[in-house]
């Protein structure tokens, strides 16, 4: 069971958390969702029941792949502008390290949401990822510390 932050109140804006997971050859785990086009990384929207972004990341990885993530570091904080009356969204990306070959063999997909998965060389994976995810993942792979982005791009005045 994942720990909950009992005094955490989710913000009014939608928050999602994703995971960068690499295999022992340095290839990126990517997933093909059933409900939208293109490829993405494990992750999803934070629950409104007091879940923290890190808990959301861990839960989504477990639900979508069956993998348990115990460690990670925040590498990207990104804002996405709302479209057609939608609210501004906040996207967080955690680098969750390496998936062993043994763990990779145990991946079990959440079939109603994920149709397939693969570990792809980073350059190939970045080409396959949906554009907003691609920019976040590229920044996250290069980040030595957390990086703040606005719509997938470095914000003016932020270093």
Residue ranges and their predicted role:
Residues 7, 75-83:
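Short, solvent-exposed loop/turn elements at beta->coil junctions and helix N-caps
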Residues 46-70, 80-132:
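Unchanged
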Residues 37-39, 111-159:
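Nudix hydrolase/Nudix homology domain
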Residues 1-18:
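Acidic, metal-coordinating catalytic segment for phosphate/diphosphate chemistry
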Residues 20-22, 75:
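Conserved positions in beta-strands of structured domains
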Residues 23-63:
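Conserved Nudix-box catalytic region and its N-terminal flanking loop in Nudix hydrolases
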